[in-house]
Amino acid sequence: SILEDDTVPHIESRMVYTVNTEAAAVLEKLAAAPRIRELGLQFSSGWNETTDKKAGYFDTGWAHPTSWDDVILQGPHLGVSTPMIKQPNPTLKHNQDWSEVDLEAMPADFIPATAYQPDRAAKPTYDADYSKWSTNAGPSPSNSYFRIAWRRMAATTGFRTLYPSLIPPGAAHVNPVH
């Protein structure tokens, strides 16, 4: 910070000055607006793609789940506003072996194919061990709610590098999805 020392949190730093009266009016309105931290938002890191797979929570294998409870979303699934822009090909040859989903032709109850499958037989605590959120009624599985997610890794060659998507209740995700 230019005006404060290291003991002042960045969020509380003062601005040096505004450029004009219009900017000052905008800054006054922004200052009066509630802060994001006041919304009480919560975060789920999802399954760790390395350690949780080794621990037996899920395994690699192509499938077309019939329930969102059996879906583990990966980054390539996500496109702008949808958790099903692509799905892995049955061959699972490499990390780019995915095909686009025809959004106009898919049925209303469509669930994308996945490359990771829950292994509830090897890990009966699969559902209980998924991340929890704090609620008034106590801890609740984070995948019980609609969530906004985005890819951690996205191509920076285009003008859109943030791919926010709405994830439906039931679906899990791996840690490269935030």
Q: Where are the regions that the model predicts?
A:
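Polybasic, glycine- and aromatic-enriched phosphate-binding surface used to engage nucleic acids
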Residues: 1-178
